[in-house]
Amino acid sequence: YEQIPKLVENAFLATEDSRFYEHSGVDFKGTARAVLVSLKGDYGSQGGSTITQQVIKNYFLSMDKTPKRKAQEIYLAYKLEQQYSKHEILEMYLNKINLGNRSYGIATAAQNYYGKELKDLTLPEVAMLAGLPKAPNNYDPTKKENVQKEKLQKPKKLRIPSKKYFTYDVFSQIARNIDG
């Protein structure tokens, strides 16, 4: 955990689980939001799984989308939080997360996409990597068509997911670098 820069930690918490340090493995508020969005027919746009649940899914369970698997995920996430610290869980997550382009884990992604160590990533690079878990292949910055598509959609998509982890100045810097 000590090798993960605070910027990387904050970026992933802001995009993936802004209440990570406040829940016990399952964020029922986030899950309820995801269910409501799904009921409206907007499938895939809202993730209800916490970082802890994603660790359980990535390390221990199949990717099946069944009620039984979801129940197992919730139960095991609660148990994982009893056995490991939040820092250990975050480290597990960042070491296994699929970031596309055959990049499993944040350190591998930093090397594959930017040829850099984690500690050497710039703010815009960290922001790009933190956005990949939602749809790694759709946002892969090495694919020319994704870069072009991203430039066309940028005005609609740029939003602040969590003011808790970044200041307005940080998001302004990200926006300037993305547009440039």
Residue positions per predicted region:
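Non-catalytic, structured segments within soluble enzyme domains
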Residues: 43, 47-180
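Flexible, acidic/glycine-enriched loop-and-adjacent beta/alpha segments
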Residues: 1-51, 104-109, 114, 121
